[in-house]
A protein has these predicted regions:
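Structural preference for long, well-ordered alpha-helical segments in enzyme cores
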Residues: 3, 74, 99, 159-163, ...
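Mid-to-C-terminal secondary-structure elements
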Residues: 38-57, 67-196
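Membrane-helix interface segments
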Residues: 31-32, 198-200, 230-231, 243
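Intracellular coupling helices
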Residues: 217-243
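Short amphipathic beta-strand/extended segments in non-transmembrane regions
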Residues: 1-54
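Exposed loop/turn and edge beta-strand positions of beta-sandwich/beta-sheet ligand-binding modules
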Residues: 64, 141, 178, 218, ...
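N-terminal membrane-entry
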Residues: 194-211
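Short linear loop/turn motifs
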Residues: 17, 57-65
Length: 243
């Protein structure tokens, strides 16, 4: 979010990190629910707009530690009276979150992880080390920015560099031979140009060719086997006088 101070081209910025996949939570009436929980900052729904169906406005709601927003899918399980109620982490009974609102479900055709529960980022210190203000070693976060319409991402590069040299120990890193830089990647190119996806495409393609080759070889072996069997049958018939 600091990027907005250095880059006026940025309309909104957010970051989030995983809390727990398949998080088991216990309601006040001892029901157990399960969902993917992520720690999100207060600008999360500015970058990824979702209609807030019930509850507090996220700009204030996600600023308060232990507040959380649940998906409409979970609302169907918990009921409309869940606002303001506490949910307890089954594994850590001393950790509680309060339902501050309900957001519209994210569509299935998104590269974002499945988010059922958005927990206010200030909660992080109760679960793990609070490195929100660290400029180095924060690779656990996913960061996104929304640019003003018509903005060329390349125009942000000088200001991003200035931001890094102002806040991070860049000279010290360079002296040690390390590199640290930030670049912007359009969301709509992630699926098409991700190195991981390219590798996986090659792996699946190779696997498909192997399966096809095995199927062809099996067919050839079956044909050869049937021909040999047929030849043996003919030889047997001739031994007994068949023409």
């Amino acid at each position: 979010p600091c990027i907005k101070r250095y880059c006026p081209e940025v309309e909104a910025a957010t970051r989030f990190t995983i809390l727990n996949e398949d998080l088991l939570l216990t309601t006040e009436d001892q029901r157990i629910i399960k969902g993917n929980a992520y720690l999100c900052d207060s600008s999360f729904f500015d970058v990824f707009p979702r209609k807030i169906l019930m509850g507090e406005e996220p700009h204030s709601g996600l600023e308060k530690a232990n507040n959380a927003y649940i998906s409409a899918k979970l609302l169907k399980v918990l009921g409309n009276d869940i606002l303001g109620k506490q949910l307890t982490w089954k594994v850590f009974p001393n950790f509680h979150i309060t339902v501050a609102g309900v957001f519209e479900d994210f569509p299935e055709n998104t590269h974002l992880p499945k988010i059922d529960i958005a927990v206010a980022l200030p909660t992080i210190g109760q679960i793990m080390g609070d490195g929100r203000d660290n400029w180095l070693g924060n690779d656990r976060y996913s960061g996104y920015v929304r640019l003003h319409p018509g903005t060329d991402p390349k125009t942000l590069e000088p200001n991003i560099k200035h931001m890094l040299y102002t806040n991070a120990p860049m000279e010290e890193l360079e002296r040690s031979g390390s590199q640290f830089y930030l670049n912007l990647k359009p969301v709509n190119t992630i699926f098409l140009s991700s190195e991981y996806n390219r590798i996986m495409n090659i792996v699946f393609l190779a696997f498909a060719f192997i399966m096809l080759a095995v199927a062809v070889l099996n067919y050839i072996l079956l044909v050869v086997s049937s021909v040999v069997k047929r030849a043996k049958s003919i030889a047997t018939y001739r031994c007994y006088g068949a023409e």
